[in-house]
Every structure is written in structure tokens, then in C-alpha cells.
């Protein structure tokens, strides 16, 4: 039964035309994956590593892990001289006997709206290598037309993304974006692959619960993510408590899917976060499998260059 479910799962995401975007619990620390307009908005050079194990302990009959596994490396930074931000993401997403290796490059033009607000206009380019190892399947019926591939087969897909990112100084952010805009198509074995277009709305706020001395500051940081492929809609709502920008923790809810816990520690320019999804009981009788996710990173703040004040002699005006 597990092998059958794994096969159905793989081809639901690949052979049946739908390539879904990757799901992350720590979306509030991984904004660039969802919205290219957010790159450089932290005014820091940030390098982040993330690993997610979906459905912990889910294996096939041979004991092989067929649950989704995701590894991600991201870098982004502001480029003040051209009022912009740039970013790059490399990731691998494994699902059963399917592997996706992708690169996303992002650029954002940052416009100042008054002294406290900036608006980012972003665009991104993505390259995806999708492969399926047909040799690992054990079909119940020889000659199954869905499993006629030989060995590992792959295809390359290119696509684009775009977004808007409004941000005030530390307090508030709001982003709208679309990924996989052109819905690129490819063929692996007998199956046509289509990258589904996704729409995202992300927002968050930093509210000071206690102000005062540096060592006593406490902030409430709620955030909200809505995603849709035009047919289905999913949302996450999360609340974090941040103690002096050093320790933080909280919880969240993913609609009809999971509740999750998040904890993090920041030491100087380094940070590490851990989240754990507690999957809600399924109505279809499938056993519950939880999902851990860990992120580590380094952020070095960059200050915009200070303009030198010029003085003019009125004689030459």
C-alpha cells in the first residue's frame, strides 16, 4: 500500500501535468523564494542554508525515503549605487524517485517613498532540471504505460517571476508576487510536465511590546502568507515573540494541514532557526507524519553611502 501511495504521489506531482511550488514553514525568513522584489530589502548581505524533511519517517516497502526532502542555499544583498537588490537561490527538491534541481536569480529596483518607506519592483529568472528514475519503480503490471521510461530521464524548464514589495523601517512589509509565470512545459517519458503559476501575498509587522533598554526589548512579529494556483488557496498565519533580537519563538497554523512551532537564536551576525510541523489528522486514513525544518544563516548589515554635502560659491551661480 505504501509503494502504491508513493507512486501515485510522484505522478500526481509530475505525470499529471502539475508541478507544485515548494512549501516552507519558515517563509518569513525566506522571502526571496516567494518574491523577487524582496531581495536587498534587509539592507544586509545574507547567506542562508535551509533543510526541510517533509513527512518524517515516510518510506516505501524497500525502506527508501520517498517523502519530500528540500535543500536550499540563498544569497541576497542591496546594491545601493543603482538603488537595487540582487539575489540567487540554488535548491534541490526530492520527492520519491523524482528530483528537482533549480536556480532562481532575482533583481529588484528599490524606490524610496518618503523617508520611511521603500517599494521594490522585482523580476526573476528560474532554471529547473527535473528528473525521474524509472528504474526504481516496481510496477504491479508489466508494460504499465505510465512507467515506460528507461532509467533516469530528465528535462530542463525555464520560467520567470515578478513581484512588488512595500516595506517601512523594520515595522511593516507587504508583498505581492507571481512565480512560474509562463508555465513552462517539458516531457519526461510518457508524461508532459507543466510548471503551475503561483500567486503569493505575504505580509508581516514588527510591534514593540516593551521599549526601553536594549537588553529588555520585546517585539511581537505576526506574519501571514497566502498562496494560490488559481484553483486552490492555502494560507499560513504565524506569531513570533522576539526578545532583544536575540531569542525568538512562536507558533503558526497552515489551513487544514498543520500547526507548527518555531524557535530561533541569533548570535551577532549568525542565526539558526528550527521549526516543526505537527500534521493534522487526515480524513483519508493515511497515517500522520510530521515535518522538521532547519535554517542557518549569516547576515552582515550594509549602510547606504552618505552623500557628501556640496557647497557652491554664489559668484558662479
Name each model-derived stretch.
Residues 13-15:
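N-terminal signal peptide c-region/cleavage motif recognized by signal peptidases
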Residues 1-4, 113-115:
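Positively charged n-region of N-terminal signal peptides that target proteins for export
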Residues 19-317:
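Subset of outer-membrane beta-barrel
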Amino acid at each position: 500500500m505504501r509503494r502504491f501511495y508513493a507512486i501515485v504521489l510522484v505522478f500526481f506531482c509530475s505525470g499529471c501535468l502539475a508541478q507544485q511550488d515548494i512549501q516552507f514553514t519558515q517563509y518569513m525568513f525566506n522571502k526571496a523564494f516567494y518574491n523577487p522584489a524582496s531581495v536587498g530589502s534587509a539592507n544586509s548581505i545574507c547567506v542562508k542554508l535551509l533543510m526541510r524533511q517533509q513527512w518524517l519517517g515516510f518510506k516505501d516497502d524497500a525502506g527508501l525515503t520517498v517523502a519530500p526532502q528540500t535543500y536550499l542555499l540563498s544569497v541576497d544583498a542591496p546594491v545601493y549605487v543603482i538603488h537595487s537588490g540582487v539575489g540567487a537561490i540554488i535548491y534541490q527538491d526530492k520527492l520519491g524517485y523524482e528530483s528537482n534541481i533549480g536556480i532562481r536569480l532575482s533583481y529588484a529596483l528599490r524606490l524610496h517613498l518618503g523617508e520611511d518607506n521603500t517599494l521594490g519592483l522585482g523580476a526573476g529568472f528560474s532554471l529547473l532540471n527535473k528528473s525521474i528514475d524509472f528504474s526504481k519503480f516496481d510496477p504491479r503490471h508489466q508494460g504499465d504505460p505510465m512507467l515506460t521510461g528507461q532509467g533516469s530521464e530528465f528535462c530542463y524548464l525555464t520560467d520567470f517571476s515578478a513581484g512588488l514589495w512595500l516595506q517601512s523601517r523594520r515595522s511593516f512589509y507587504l508583498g505581492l508576487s507571481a512565480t512560474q509565470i509562463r508555465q513552462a512545459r517539458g516531457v519526461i517519458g510518457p508524461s508532459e510536465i507543466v510548471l503551475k503559476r503561483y500567486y503569493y501575498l505575504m505580509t508581516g509587522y514588527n510591534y514593540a511590546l516593551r521599549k526601553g533598554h536594549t537588553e529588555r526589548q520585546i517585539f511581537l512579529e505576526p506574519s501571514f502568507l497566502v498562496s494560490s494556483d488559481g484553483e486552490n488557496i492555502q494560507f499560513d498565519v504565524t506569531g513570533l515573540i522576539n526578545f532583544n533580537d536575540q531569542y525568538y519563538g512562536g507558533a503558526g497554523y497552515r489551513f487544514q494541514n498543520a500547526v507548527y512551532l518555531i524557535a530561533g537564536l541569533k548570535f551577532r551576525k549568525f542565526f539558526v532557526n528550527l521549526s516543526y510541523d505537527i500534521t493534522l489528522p487526515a480524513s483519508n486514513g493515511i497515517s500522520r507524519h510530521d515535518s522538521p525544518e532547519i535554517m542557518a544563516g549569516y547576515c552582515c548589515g550594509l549602510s547606504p553611502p552618505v552623500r557628501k554635502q556640496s557647497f557652491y560659491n554664489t559668484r558662479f551661480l
